[in-house]
C-alpha cells in the first residue's frame, strides 16, 4: 500500500520562537533574510543563503583565494536537468561555485555540470588546494580543484578564476565507482576511492566484476600538471591475491593528513553506513612510499599500517578525521605516563584523538541509529572508541520527533577543516533531518552539543519516502548533508534535497568559547 503525504517536518517557526523563549533563555536566529529561508536553532543564526539553483548538494568546500572566500558545493544526481538562470540552459548537476566573501550576500559565480549524462550526471565530491600551499610552491597564485565526475572519473581543474574553471586532466577514468577524495595540501598526496577489477571488498555493488570491489588510489599531486600514481590501498583481505575471509567492507573515505609530529598518515573509514560492518584504519604514508612499489599484498599493507579497529557490525564508518594534540585542561596536573609496550603518547596533558561518523542511510528511522564517535589515538596501533555523539529522536517537545517523518535522521559526516577557530575545538556534524549539530570537543572524553540549526523546507525541497511494515509514506523534509567551516568562524551547510546552502554563525556562549583560543 502506498500512502503519500506532503507535510512539514517541523511546526511553524513562530510557534518555535515562543517555545524556545520560555526554555533555557536560548536565542533563536532573527536576521534580515527572507522569512521562508529561516530555520530553527539554538545558539546559531542565519547569516546568508543561496538556493544553489534548487540542486541537491552533497558537500561544501570553502577555499580562501587571495582576499576572497570561494564556496565549492558538490552536487548529487537529482531528478534530471535543472535550469541554470545564468545562461538560460537546462544543465545536469555538477558543482556550484559561489563567492562568499560577504557571507550575508553569497554570489553565484558558476555552475559547472558533470562531464557525463545520466546516470552519471553528478559530481558528488570536491576538494581544493592553493598552489602556494602545495610542496614546492610551483604555482603561486593558482588554485586547483579535484572532483568526482559521476561514477566514472576523478577530474582535476584550474579554478584560479572560479567563474571560469579549466579542465586540466582526468586523474582516473573508466570507473564504475567514485567517492570522497581527500587532498592533503601540505604533502600534495591525494586519496581517491574507486572501483577495482582486482582489489576486493564487500558491502556495495561498486564494480561489475564478480569478486572484485573498491579500493583507494593514491597519487602525488604536488604538481597538478604532472600527477603521479603511487599505489592502490585498502585493508588486509582486500588485496588481489589475499585469501583472508571474510573480505572486509568497502572503503568510503581515506583522509590523508600531515602532522608536524607524526608525519603524513592515512585515516581510513570503511563500511559507510549502519549495518555496514565498519573498520577504522591508521597508516603511515612514509612507509607506503618506502616500499618502493605499489601495494600488492596483505604483507605490504601490514608493513605500513599503524593500527586498525573493527567496529561493531551496526557501525559502518563513513568518515575518520584526526583530532590531534588536544590540550586537556582536566589533565593539567597529571605527570607524564610510563611508556607503553608499543609506541604512543605519554603526555596526559596533550592527547591524540580521531573523530569518526556513521552514515544514516535508512529513511524513517528504520534500523540502527547513526551517530559519530571519538576514537582514542594516543596509542594509534590500538585505536579505541571512547565516546559517542548522538542526537535523541525525540528532542524536547513533539515538534522535534525526528522519527515521525519519512526522512533520514542520524549522522552523516564530520566537518574536515584544518584551521582555527573551529579546528581542535568545535566540530560541525551534519545530521540530515536533524540539521547541523555543533559539538564542543575540547574534552574529547565528554563531547557536548552546544548549538544546532535546522533549515526550513522551501519550494525546492524534494520529497523523502520511507517504507515501514510494508507501508510507504512520503514527507518534504530537509536533509543537511555536509558542513564546512572557515577561518572567520562561519559554518556552511548544504541540503541533500535541493533546499540550498545556509551560511551560519554561532551566538551566545558557544560563540564566546569558539573565539577564546585558550584551553577551557
Indicate where each model-derived feature is located:
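Bacterial N-terminal signal peptides that target proteins for export
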Residues: 1-15
